[in-house]
Amino acid sequence: MEKLEISSCRTSDSTGYDRVWAQIDMDAVLFNMESMRANIREDVKIVAVLKTNGYGHGAAAIMKEMEKLSYVWGYAAATFEEAKELRENGAKKPILLLGYVFPYCYRELARLEIRPSCFREDMLEELSAAAEKEGKPVLIHIALDTGMGRIGIRPDDEGLSFVRKAMNTPGLIVEGMFTHFAKADEEDHGPTHTQIALYTGFRDRIRKELELEIPLCHCSNSAGIIEFPEANMNLVRAGITLYGLWPSSEVSRTIVPLRPVMTLYSRIVYIKDAGPGVSVSYGGTYTTSAEKTRIATIPVGYGDGYPRSLSGKGYVLICGKKAPILGRVCMDQTMVDITHIPEAREGSLVTLIGRDGGESITMEQLGDLSGRFNYELACDINPRVPRVICGGTLG
């Protein structure tokens, strides 16, 4: 659908949704992809990271836009179920699994031509058996731990033995090797330079001692794309920046311009006037003190992924003005103060994330207010919230 031009004090718009909805701007997705592409070599391709339902933005819809882009190599998911869902929704490009896959998934993984990350010898043996049963090879990416301390072989003699076994295991093809930066989003670049050196040194050992040229080498995550162009290799993995969000406050915001993809809306469903001494929400943590307080109820709460930790300190936007949250955010409802917004009425638009007139509230600002961070907030906007797609080639 076309991008919605929503007037903040109108009581109806042609969205088809009223309680709450997340508007997903595909034009912003494409802008962010092109912006990242401009900061990498022309021969480097991008992996669109679509785990956790595309960081809460809707993986299937974003995947369908990515299918058209020649510079997108494929997708990355965290779980087999996520990867399978992408295939079922029409993904033709390669899909890489970044986490562990349990053996009972291996045959279907082989059938769907999903690339697993490998870092345990038993995985090699069981994937080989699955490849034989399905009658097709399994392309694997070796996970290398250069400083993250989670999954991955180490860049040492034992790791080299693992690569040797992988390249000699029937039915398996070593297509790629990747590592993950632990501190690329921090001002101190030293630890990331160390990780890059460990990766390239191990890759060179593989070339020399095993005479193996791994086709796809990738290190850079979103922060790496921005701050470490020397780590681009063959592929880069675009995660949080794909959605127009920043990896951290320490990452440059001028090298790769970004546009937020998600705007979160609701509507006022009830307004009441309260005199002094009226408690609001659970626990009575807020009590009115003014002669008259105008309280609006919004049908959104932590059951939708809107943080309860915003209780008493967050705000929403109504008619281009900030409306502070009163008391505790409930599971399904939130109350705000609209005493200073006389034009607000039942049905008026509420912006929980996004811009309204001259005011805005970003995912990063919500994170600061709630004591969380933007990755978490985006992923927590759950399936109860409809995603309304606008813009792009399919919108």
Where in the sequence are the language-model features?
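Active-site anion/phosphate-binding pocket segments in diverse small-molecule metabolic enzymes
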Residues: 2-30, 81-82, 101, 108, ...
